[in-house]
């Protein structure tokens, strides 16, 4: 997107830019899109903020995909090395003759990012009083995303994340669907809602009384699938609101099937490599596809030299009858006596909204010897698995009691082929709020049984717990009590108190336990420091004392340097905010920037927009932010960088007043006329707060459309500040009209100095009441303006040459700072009385006086008077005794030069212009100029 220099103000937006932001257009990516005719786009461009707003018709913008960003906006992040570490030590002192023991542990996980590649490894060190310390490596692999096929590739040695297979360690590679690259509504099963609207209507979905979807549909049939469920198993309540207010209502039955993905979604896994346990090569393939009519099909294959298996599954939504899934599997393990085995796996789910009840049931039946996965076969070789299971059944019931709480039951029953053993377990639990929601009560009854022939072993445990949160930001936050009783055995009681301090950086917990004349007191806490987290604990009992402690954190190295911090997940962001040292990051607890304004955070959502905000209330007093929130869209495992523009300076409160003493109106727009063009709004009574200001600056104030509703204010911040560290100032005599500004005025002494205006050289034309005329070529420009009675004017700038002109109607003062300028031409058209020019110089070697005369009646005369009380100067042409120079006598120019022995003119002096006329009947007009030459640019 760009402007053509010298052409019209129309700009070019390439098709590629529109496509990147999600507009559905087609065309040559490098060509400019036809905005008006083709797309009917509207645009708005802010030159100062460099912001372009594009307004697009909804028909060119596809429906938002539930937070997933366009692929072209995904950020692979910085090349960086992040290393997390965890060091801990335990020490036990046993009372009596037992020997004390200790152990030491270290876990170091370097993570290297190079472009889209993520290289991961882990090193673990263990040592105790019985063994020497030794290092071990759990994994070393590289991974990357493949956005064009929405997949993820892993290559190396380790445990790889596979959804449809039991995990084991191997050397090889994995290619699988990256579900994070799909929006939730495209991958997760939810029923397609179909209906018909008589008019343009609003369609709303509700689940458990909560609105989860709302959209406008045209007249006719509609089919909606791009919505996100609330996470419950409740039916969908659909409301269609027509234009005339009539409402259609219907219910769509829903239950999460055990095997189900969205129609059209495909999930696959491919794994190949060499197993660590047996050094055998293997292949694993898995494929899941969502089909029409609420069907989902699943198939998987595992193959090795000694093992092979096949699974086929089918899931189906049954509407009001619930959801059913069926999986059939067959395996062949050549190293087992029962090599050919089969299994059937049936799962059923049903939600009953009228009873606030959810049911689930599963049954698995296996042939003699038992079905095995490849992981089972590998464990069998080292004696860690036996193919003995025959049937297993699992059931659960979840029932809501409304304000009385919730009641849940689950049970498992299993039998075996060889020894006729049976195992059963039951769990009944209840939870509710008590004391009007000020405390929580929970309880559970757990029973387990093991039956072998005529023997039966059972165990029953009753647990009851109460938790009372205080909702405090510091100090004691909660008190809890838990008791556990074993039938025919001991009972235990635990009383705990938890709290936090220092803005939740310090967490602590104290627990007192008692069981059968045996007591235990323990204390535990951790502190979230800026660069690491430390933890420690100590417990005392009749048998032993136990002390432990540790430290964990992370070190990030990238091209910008080194950042220390806590270990914060895999997908991360670097924060760079120079000038915002020790500033908190919103939503990240106690994490804050270091002394350079740098930090890192983690646990970002990949492929989605993540907002990262600095807390302005924690900024240093002399800092402010133009924008407090930046957005990043990282890929999985990326370390992206986000930068904040921090302004250093005093926080200033000004009172802006017009020349008549009235305050500048509420809501007036104020622009700080520096390189960043920051804007603010005037508050009540003309008060203006500048979040960050230099000691001096210039403000442009606008409160209306007319020239009498505009002004420019210069200010200097003094030392007057209030208890909050805000400096106080005021602005009197604010004037309309404005020119351009380039540099601060260094010689002003007032805390706030009013000026007529300032001019910036990039403007080509500016006109106001036919009095303003500007011209600009490269670095040179000239201005004519009306000064008026009692007005002051200040002109400064980084340009090389500048010309100024003024109608001196009644004793005006022109204040000129020549500091950055090499040549200045100052001209004055004056009709009567006196004009004064106050100069501030920067190593000026001479000033040349120039004049041209517009004579109306031939009788007018005028002269310069040079005045300075601190030194004597001469003009190179012949002067009269009064140092007056007749204008008619200096047609070739006259120079003001330093006195003998001096190299430059003084830093500040005053030159007074005076004109008189011999006839009062005809107005006279003179043009007087100054050519100032400096040897310093």
From Swiss-Prot:
GO terms for cellular component: cell outer membrane. The keyword Membrane applies. GO terms for biological process: pilus assembly. It is found in: Cell outer membrane. Pfam families: PapC_C, PapC_N, Usher. A 97 kDa form of the protein is thought to be due to post-translational processing of isoform 104 kDa. Disulfide bonds: none annotated. Keywords: Cell outer membrane, Fimbrium biogenesis, Membrane, RNA suppression of termination, Transmembrane, Transmembrane beta strand, Transport. The keyword Membrane applies. Transmembrane segments: none annotated. Gene3D superfamilies: 2.60.40.2070, 2.60.40.3110, Outer membrane usher protein FimD, plug domain. It is a multi-pass membrane protein. One of its GO terms (molecular function) is fimbrial usher porin activity. Suppression of amber codon 754 seems to be amino acid specific; a supE suppressor (usually Gln) permits function, whereas a supF suppressor (Tyr) does not. PANTHER family: F1 CAPSULE-ANCHORING PROTEIN, OUTER MEMBRANE USHER PROTEIN. Belongs to the fimbrial export usher family. These proteins are essential for the biogenesis of mature CS3 pili, but not for synthesis of the CS3 pilin subunit. This is Outer membrane usher protein CS3-2. It comes from Escherichia coli.
């Amino acid at each position: 997107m760009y402007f053509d220099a010298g052409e019209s103000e129309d700009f070019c937006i390439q098709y590629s830019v529109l496509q990147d932001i999600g507009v559905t257009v087609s065309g040559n990516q490098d060509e400019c899109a036809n905005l008006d005719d083709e797309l009917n786009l509207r645009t708005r461009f802010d030159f100062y903020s460099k912001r372009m707003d594009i307004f697009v018709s909804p028909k060119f913008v596809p429906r938002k995909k539930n937070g997933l960003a366009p692929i072209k906006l995904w950020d692979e992040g910085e090349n960086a090395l992040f290393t997390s570490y965890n060091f801990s030590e335990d020490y036990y002192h046993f009372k009596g003759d037992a020997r004390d023991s200790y152990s030491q542990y270290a876990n170091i996980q370097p993570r290297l990012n190079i472009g889209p590649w993520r290289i991961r490894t882990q090193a673990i060190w263990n040592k105790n009083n019985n063994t020497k310390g030794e290092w071990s490596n759990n994994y070393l692999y590289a991974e990357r995303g493949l956005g064009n096929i929405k997949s993820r590739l892993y290559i190396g040695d380790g445990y790889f994340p596979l959804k449809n297979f039991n995990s084991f360690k191997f050397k090889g590679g994995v290619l699988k669907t990256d579900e994070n690259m799909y929006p939730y509504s495209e991958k997760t099963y939810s029923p397609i809602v179909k209906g018909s609207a008589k008019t343009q209507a609003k369609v709303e979905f509700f689940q458990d009384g909560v609105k989860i979807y709302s959209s406008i549909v045209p007249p006719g049939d509609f089919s909606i699938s791009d919505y996100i469920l609330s996470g419950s198993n409740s039916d969908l309540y659909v409301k269609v609101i027509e234009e005339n207010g009539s409402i259609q209502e219907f219910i769509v039955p829903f239950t999460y099937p055990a095997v189900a993905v969205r129609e059209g979604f495909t999930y696959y896994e491919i794994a190949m490599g060499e197993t660590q346990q047996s050094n055998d090569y293997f292949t694993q393939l898995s494929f899941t596809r969502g089909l029409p009519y609420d069907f989902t099909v699943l198939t998987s294959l595992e193959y090795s030299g000694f093992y092979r298996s096949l699974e086929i599954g089918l899931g189906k939504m049954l509407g009001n009858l619930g959801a059913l899934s069926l999986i059939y599997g067959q395996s062949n393990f050549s190293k087992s006596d029962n090599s050919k085995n089969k299994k059937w796996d049936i799962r059923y789910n049903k939600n009953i909204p009228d009873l606030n009840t959810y049911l689930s049931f599963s049954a698995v039946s296996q042939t003699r010897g038992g079905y095995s996965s490849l992981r089972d076969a590998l464990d069998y070789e080292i004696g860690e698995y036996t193919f003995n299971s025959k049937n297993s059944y699992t059931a659960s019931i979840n029932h809501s009691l409304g304000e009385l709480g919730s009641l849940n039951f689950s049970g498992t029953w299993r039998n075996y082929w060889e020894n006729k053993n049976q195992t059963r377990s039951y769990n009944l639990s209840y939870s509710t709020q008590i004391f009007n929601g000020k405390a929580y009560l929970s309880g559970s009854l757990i029973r387990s049984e093991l039956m072998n022939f005529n023997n039966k072993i059972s165990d029953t445990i009753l647990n009851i717990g109460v938790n009372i949160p205080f909702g405090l930001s510091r100090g004691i936050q909660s008190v809890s009590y838990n008791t556990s009783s074993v039938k025919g055995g001991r009972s235990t009681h635990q009383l705990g108190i938890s709290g936090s301090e220092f803005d939740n950086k310090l967490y602590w917990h104290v627990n007192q336990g008692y069981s059968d004349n045996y007591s235990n007191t323990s204390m535990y806490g951790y502190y979230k420091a800026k660069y690491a987290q430390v933890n420690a604990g100590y417990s005392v009992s009749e048998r032993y004392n136990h002390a432990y402690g540790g430290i964990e954190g992370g070190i990030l190295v990238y091209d910008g340097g080194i950042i220390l911090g806590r270990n914060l997940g895999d997908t991360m962001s670097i924060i760079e905010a120079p000038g915002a040292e020790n500033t908190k990051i919103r939503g990240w607890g106690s994490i804050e920037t270091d002394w350079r304004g740098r930090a890192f955070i983690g646990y970002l959502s990949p492929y989605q927009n993540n907002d990262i905000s600095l807390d302005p209330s924690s900024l240093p007093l002399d800092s402010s932010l133009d924008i407090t929130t930046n957005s990043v869209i990282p890929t999985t495992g990326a370390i992206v960088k986000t930068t904040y523009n921090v302004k250093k300076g005093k926080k200033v409160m000004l009172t802006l007043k017009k020349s008549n003493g009235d305050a500048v109106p509420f809501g007036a727009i104020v622009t700080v006329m520096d390189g960043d063009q920051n804007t603010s709004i005037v508050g009540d009574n003309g008060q203006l707060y500048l979040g960050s200001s230099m000691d001096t600056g210039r403000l442009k104030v606008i409160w209306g459309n007319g020239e009498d509703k505009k002004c420019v204010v210069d200010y200097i911040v003094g030392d007057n500040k209030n208890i909050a560290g805000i400096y106080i100032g005021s602005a009197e005599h604010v004037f309309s009209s404005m020119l351009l500004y380039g540099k601060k005025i260094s010689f002003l002494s007032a805390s706030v100095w009013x000026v007529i205006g300032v001019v910036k050289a990039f403007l080509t034309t500016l006109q106001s009441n036919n009095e303003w005329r500007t011209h600009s070529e490269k670095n040179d420009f000239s201005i004519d303006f009306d000064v008026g009675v009692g007005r002051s004017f200040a002109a400064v700038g980084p340009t090389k040459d500048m010309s100024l002109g003024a109608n001196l109607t009644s004793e005006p003062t022109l204040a000129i700072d020549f500091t950055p300028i090499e040549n200045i031409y100052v001209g004055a058209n004056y009709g009567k009385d006196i004009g004064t020019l106050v100069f501030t110089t920067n190593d000026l070697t001479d000033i040349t006086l120039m004049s041209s005369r517009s004579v109306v009646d031939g009788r007018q005369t005028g002269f310069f008077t040079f005045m300075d009380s601190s030194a004597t100067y001469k003009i190179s042409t012949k002067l009269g005794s009064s140092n007056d120079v007749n204008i008619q006598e200096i047609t070739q120019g006259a120079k003001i030069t330093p006195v003998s022995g001096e190299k430059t003119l003084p830093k500040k002096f005053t030159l007074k212009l005076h004109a008189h006329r011999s006839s009062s009947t005809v107005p006279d007009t003179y043009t007087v100029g100054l050519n100032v030459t400096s040897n310093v640019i």
